């Protein structure tokens, strides 16, 4: 997130809010994760279903956007995957940062195994990168000097 802020990419936060026992305003589940709170100038969206596209203002923003989004978060097996699939069906470009996301365990399958699988499936719907690789791909490039520099 710090890299995105540093290079001037807009940062948005999306959280689940509903009338359920877990995702209503009175529970700790709707709080931001410590160290990952929005800054005053950043967008906040609230949704009632797993996909970010369940939030009409988010969906409208994506429909007007020319670029794609970089997606990271919790939970990979529900929110991230459903957002990737919705984006794919709308021809929106998504880059999923698999190591900046996490998934829940499902029954007897451990969380890390679920997350590895989600990360592989995500590649069907968007680009999947580790954070360091994505950062390196978005750093400003310096023009080379010498015989192999081109020009």
Regions found by a protein language model. Give the residues of each.
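Active-site-adjacent betaalpha module
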Residues: 6-7, 19-151
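A short, N-terminal amphipathic alpha-helix
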Residues: 1-10
